[in-house]
């Protein structure tokens, strides 16, 4: 979802 903030890998 929050790809606009920082690139979090959803684990």
Curated annotation (Swiss-Prot):
Predominant localisation class: secreted
One example of a Gene Ontology biological process annotation: neuropeptide signaling pathway
Record-listed Valine amide modification sites: 11
Keyword tRNA-binding found: no
Keywords noted in UniProt: Amidation, Neuropeptide, Secreted
Localization terms from the record: Secreted
InterPro entries the UniProt entry points to: Periviscerokinin
Pfam families in UniProt: Periviscerokin
Gene Ontology CC annotation, any one: extracellular region
Function in brief: Mediates visceral muscle contractile activity (myotropic activity).
Similarity remark: Belongs to the periviscerokinin family.
UniProt protein name: CAPA-Periviscerokinin-1
Organism: Striatophasma naukluftense (Gladiator)
């Amino acid at each position: 979802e929050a790809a606009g903030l920082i690139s979090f890998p959803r684990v």
